[in-house]
Amino acid sequence: MYKRQVLTGTPIRQELLNGNREAGRQFCGFTADKPVLMIIGGSLGAASVNDHVRKILPELLKDFQVIHLCGKGKMDEKLTGTAGYVQYEYIKDELPDLFALADVVISRAGANAICEISALHKPNLLIPLSANASRGDQILNARSFEKQGYSMVLEEEEITDQKLLDTIHKLYQERHSLSLIHI
């Protein structure tokens, strides 16, 4: 290494590291009696993930409160006001507080998303974009994190409503065993 060089990783927005769990709870109107599942569809949303989540929402709400970042134009107005469920197209200022509130996270496997989730030590389920819809980089990212014990992975082509529900419950039950917690 040369004296004037610095080796870095992916830049992380520092404000994400300073979230306040109670501020997040207040923003969402959630109670402290159930764990919080945060679903991030990316800036464009993840239509198939959104659809599956909405189909299993009644089952999810038995055990979780759900924050659903569904992407621009992807909100389902019929679900507005559902107890224990909030949906947003996009969140900026409150995002650190929502991350602090989340017990487990479901996300795509883009490089920035997984680096932020890693920095926050959040147990996570990654649903990478399919090889048909991408360069395949998200699949490689997700499998790398899974192999190291940092994440659980569910391929988009393999998702069924029941499989997603079962995997979410497994993620929560095994959240302390994911080695990401210990990074």
How should these model regions be labeled?
Residues 3-22, 27-30:
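Active-site-proximal region of nucleotide-activated glycan assembly enzymes
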Residues 8-10, 127-130, 154-158:
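Short beta->alpha connector loops at strand-helix junctions that form conserved
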Residues 7, 116-119, 135-148:
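Short acidic/histidine- and often glycine-rich active-site loop of Leloir-type glycosyltransferases
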Residues 107, 123-135:
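Short hydrophobic beta-strand element within catalytic cores of glycosyltransferases
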Residues 21-23, 30-105, 139-143, 147, ...:
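Donor-nucleotide binding loops and adjacent catalytic segments primarily
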Residues 168-176:
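Short, hydrophobic alpha-helical segments
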Residues 1-5, 181-183:
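Conserved small/polar residues in nucleotide/adenosyl-binding loops
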Residues 88, 100-115, 122-123:
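Acidic donor-binding loop of glycosyltransferase active sites
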